[in-house]
Amino acid sequence: MNFGVVPVENSSEGVVNATLNSLADEDIKICGETYLAIHHQLGSAKKFKLADAQTIASHPQALGQCSKWLDANLPNAKREATSSTAEAAKLSKSQPKTLCIVSSLAISKYKLHHYHKNIEDSSFNNTRFLIIGNIEIDQTKQDKTSFLIQTDNQPGSLIKILEPFNKRKINLERIETRPSRESLNAHNFFIDSTCLLYTSDAADEEDS
């Protein structure tokens, strides 16, 4: 039994495209979801004056979630995207005059100098995480159903997808569209609904 946790949507920066692409490409199951408040810390491996900072490193989502604070307080420092906030902490150790945006856990783990706490632009900054796995879990009354539907890029395609849900009064909480990476003339629609997968209504939609 293997499970993983991946970010899918942030309240400030929106959808995490890499996660949607992976959901489309891989044969995995969504087993649950959770929302977490996200707080960002400004640190560096070696202490120096903030005015001397040349680079600010972090994951693109973290850079985006702190962009207004960075514009106001460190407008001259170059922003460098890393694959994770942990990689940003490591870069700060190897690259002089480099700040990193990381979690409070990373500040402690990597023994970083802590300049400022909670530098995210929104005090309500939160991220929705999906719990993914390779097994089906038992259903509950609070379950949702997530659909991935691919359709040709033609007038009325989205209406045809949504009409059966409307007919059966199935509430859709979220719709995201992404270009298909398999065809230039197709799009993928990621849909979250409040109905259970194995109810008759949901089964009808899956088959239609």
Label for each model-derived stretch:
Residues 198-208:
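Single conserved hydrophobic/aromatic residue that forms the stacking wall/gate
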